[in-house]
Amino acid sequence: MPSMLVLVGTMPSLASLVSLGGACASVSGTSSSDASYALVKRVSLSRRSVKGTKKWLCRYSVSSSTTTTTADFIADQNNNSVSIDSNSFRGSKDGDDSEVVLKQTPKPVLKPPVARVERGLGVNTAPWSKDLSNGGKFDGEEERNKVIESLGEVLDKAEKLEIPKPGNKEGGEAVKPSQPSANSSNSRNGSYANASDGGTRKTKTMKSVWRKGDAVAAVQKVVKESPKIFNRGVQTEPRTREEGEVNAKAGTPLAPPQPPFRPQPPVRPQPMLQGKPMVAPPVKKSPILKDLGMAAKPLVSEEVDSSVKSKERKPILVDKFASKKKGVDPAASQAVLAPTKPGKGPPSNKFRVEHRNKKNASASPRRRIVAEDDGDDDASISRSGRKGRKWSKASRKAVRLQAAKDAAPVKAEILEVEEEGMSIEDLAYNLAIGEGDILGYLYSKGIRPDGVHTLDREMVKMICRDYDVEVLDADSVKVEEMAKKRQTFDEEDLDKLEDRPPVITIMGHVDHGKTTLLDYIRKSKVAASEAGGITQGIGAYKVSVPVDGKLQSCVFLDTPGHEAFGAMRARGARVTDIAIIVVAADDGIRPQTNEAIAHAKAAAVPIVIAINKIDKEGASPDRVMQELSSIGLMPEDWGGDVPMVQISALKGENVDDLLETVMLVAELQELKANPHRNAKGIVIEAGLDKAKGPFATFIVQKGTLKRGDVVVCGEAFGKVRALFDHSGERVDEAGPSIPVQVIGLNNVPIAGDEFEIVSSLDVAREMAEARAVSLRDERISAKAGDGKVTLSSLASAVSAKKMSGLDLHQLNIILKVDVQGSIEAVRQALQVLPQENVTLKFLLQATGDVSNSDVDLASASEAIVFGFNVKASGSVKKAAENKGVEIRLYRVIYELIDDVRNAMEGLLESVEEQIPIGSAEVRATFSSGSGRVAGCMVNEGKFVKDCGIRVVRKGKTVHVGVLDSLKRVKENVKEVSAGLECGIGMDDYDDWIEGDIIEAFNAVQKRRTLEEASASMSAAIEEAGV
């Protein structure tokens, strides 16, 4: 870049040729350095020849404070700037060039120095024309006119500028005290820099010719020029200057002559004059005042890119004496307050207001002024500082209260309550009250609900009545719903269906001959080996039946007939294709017969009636058929659609006809399944074997189950290690409709769960864990005897006059059974027992033999261990004996139910029963040494000493006590019979009146039954008016 004389125009420095009052800096070479600034008074241009070269001469006269300097510059053909004459003297004044008068202003606010930036061309830069510097023709008069015209134009525009108040960061930059440069002695104008160090003359502040402008102070200033502004095609870069310094580096070997050093007074910095940009400043956007608590928008700092700085438009001239009150911008009157954060901040006080005012005295207010287009301009700028206002404690509390109010439960108007009642927690939630309110209600009624979690339906109704909530009885899921048969076909299976064996379930009342019929079909003796002669589990068997001379496979399920095994019958009906209902010809339809028929109808399976025991005396098949027709099962012989076959299972009479009928019905159903897919089915039974571990009996409904498959059923999963058929033989696979026992599960599944084959153990584990989470709460609530409070319990407290507590007994039970289905059966049988005074609590219900851990649990909780179809080893029995734990093992469910009943009745308190033994009438009263004595005539029975007597006066009992003294003719006797007179005395009563009736009785303690206790509770409820 060729050297040239660069004229930069800013107010308190050497004026350029374009703007008077600017600064003139001599720049040599390609590097820029600091320059000396002063006020230009005269500028003249001429061309002269020096030593045979054509050069341009620039003569200017500068006035700085009281010093006037005249310097000559020449520019050679290479545009190198060289000084050929320089004079500096103090107190020089010309007639026309009077000293500049400046206005006095306060000291500007200092700002820390900013990093030095490469200096570029100024706003009003007037570079030398390249053509002229290379020796072109120059018309001095024409150029002089152009300069004068441009200077006048600048003066006119400067007088019209609006000057914002000083100190505002928006109006200009703070200045920095000038410091003499280390290399100022080498610079061409070094004398001016040195004058600030050695000058002692007092600076005079006078009125400025600019009328408006910054004050003049002999302090160092840091002047940051405006950001990039395009003016006359020249782009300026932001830079920092230190006033009073000139660092001009010569671009040629020729060194300029230096004037002799003379001390000078301090240089007066002049107000800056920035050239007015060609593009008009944008209209001020309406500010958005944010809350004081919000983070203030950071000002553009040195780290921010210069492209961001260029978006800020700052005034050119700054007047320190301008009014601090800004003019009202019309756009600012339409400012919109931004929404604040939720919650009310802490109230402001005087101290905070004063502190805020002091802190922001020289800065902008704490309220952010956000332009409407900030979102577009500053979208990519990362702003430092706080993210937002910290909420006060009151704000956080208000938000928490509002959130709690929104999440508060809503009072229900109608509440459905199931038969087993409702927990206290659920009731409190539905009534939108606290659990303490319900507990307080129970205490007010004389109930101490310690450890109580569930209220029965009647108690819930009574509580809801006080809160004006209607209660509806919600029926629990009936067993018929469990028996509903599910669809086993998928669309992808329709093209691969094959015939499958029918699944036939034998159902009916207990002891009607179901297992005997199956024994004849299987040619086995299962019934003889059953405990008590009754079936207590589902038996699945595969049998080959001869049909038309060919053997066809059938699967028979033998279900229990006892009332306690309703769930088992429902599961049997759910997987069956045909239901055989066995009815004894000598007994007719019984309760379990009706239940089995209901299960079959719910499962929508065909029904075949087998009227059994026709060879027995008193058998009446016609009566049975008539009873069946009365409940909707019309025999085919009578024009109906229900096949009925009269058989004798014991002798095998007509059993073949029954099988032929069953196979005909199965053929009409066209039973098919897809064996070429992963197996799916249902668990009909499950248990824990001491040698095999957890096992389960599956009925495959579709697909083929193979050894090695990964199976998941409910919360149990595992890899199939072994498969056993109904006879105990190992098999490798099981197709549709085939029952099979599976070994390899991690725990005992729940009977009735569906199983399916998955790809890996990880998938099976995830599915089992998800299922376990959903079943955990159901299992907890399903435990019987978890402390239920009933109206009978309330009546017990009322009748016993025990208002301080609840007279409630509890029997803790640990139940161990052989298979999962037996748990359901035992619990259903025990739930039938009245539990108004004694409740049952099952601490543990599991499959497997009795173990030492069961004994430890029973010892800690004072429970009884009941085992059903399980065993207890000798070591376990010995440990139980040492710890005082009772173990009861049963093979028949009848015996278990009877013993549990006896245990519950043993916890009931005995009642006192008064047995009358005699009656007497008071004929006279007399006094004796021991008090008043009643002379009586024994009308009936006898009176015995120390027996109980009751004094009845006018039909009302006035006293009940013990006969303490009995005399006959002044002699103490033990007994007085009817028809004799005697004297009767009591230690605690002597208010005898003639005509009183005295009744004698004996008090005996009598044990109550559960039914008697329940009746007494009902009477207490009525008496209490609850």
Swiss-Prot record:
Region (Disordered) location: 158-208, 230-284, 300-393
Lineage: Eukaryota, Viridiplantae, Streptophyta, Embryophyta, Tracheophyta
GO annotation, cellular component aspect: chloroplast; chloroplast envelope; chloroplast stroma; nucleus
Record-stated family: Belongs to the TRAFAC class translation factor GTPase superfamily. Classic translation factor GTPase family. IF-2 subfamily.
Gene Ontology molecular function: any one: mRNA binding
UniProt binding sites for GTP: 508-515, 558-562, 612-615
One Pfam match: EF-G_D2
Stretches for region G1: 508-515
NCBIfam families for this protein: IF-2, small_GTP
Name of protein: Translation initiation factor IF-2, chloroplastic
